Amino acid sequence: MSVKKSHGALKASAIIALGGGFPQYEGDVDLSEIGQWIRSESIDHKLDNITFFLVHQTCQEKLGGSQVALRLETHLRGGDPYCRKPFFSFVEKMMGYLNQSCAHVQIGGDVYRIEL
C-alpha cells in the first residue's frame, strides 16, 4: 500500500469500483479512520464492524469495464442526502441494489475485492 503522512494523519490514494453508472470519486484515504479496518484484518480475512470483508489480490490489474470508482472515505461528499451515511453502509446498500456480491478496491498499487 502506498502511504504518505500529511498533518499527522496517514493517507493513501484509493479507488473503489461498484459499477452501475455512479459518478466517479477518487482521492486520499485517511488511514486513521478507514485504514484501521484494513490493518486489523484477521487471519481469515474478516474485518470487525462490517458485514463484508476484503480479499487482497496480488495481481496488479486495473479496474475497468463498466465499473465506476467511488472514493473510500468515512462519509461520501455530495449534495444527495442518502450519500451522507457511513461509507461501508453505502457500499453494502449499493452492492445489494445492483445485485453484486463483490466490488473491487484499489488502494495505492494494491487491488482488493470486497465480498458480501
PLM feature spans:
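A compositionally biased, intrinsically disordered/low-complexity signal enriched
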Residues: 12-16, 34, 38, 90
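Short, flexible N-terminal segments of the mature chain
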Residues: 23-50
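Short, extreme N-terminal segment that most often corresponds to the first beta-strand
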Residues: 1-28
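Short, compact, well-ordered microdomains
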Residues: 72-115
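Short, intrinsically disordered low-complexity segments
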Residues: 42-81
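Hydrophobic beta-strand segments of well-ordered beta-sheets in folded domains
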Residues: 12-14, 68-70, 103
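A structural detector for beta-sheet-dominated domains
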Residues: 15-19, 55, 73, 106-108
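Short secondary-structure capping micro-motifs at structural edges
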Residues: 1-4, 56-58, 90-91
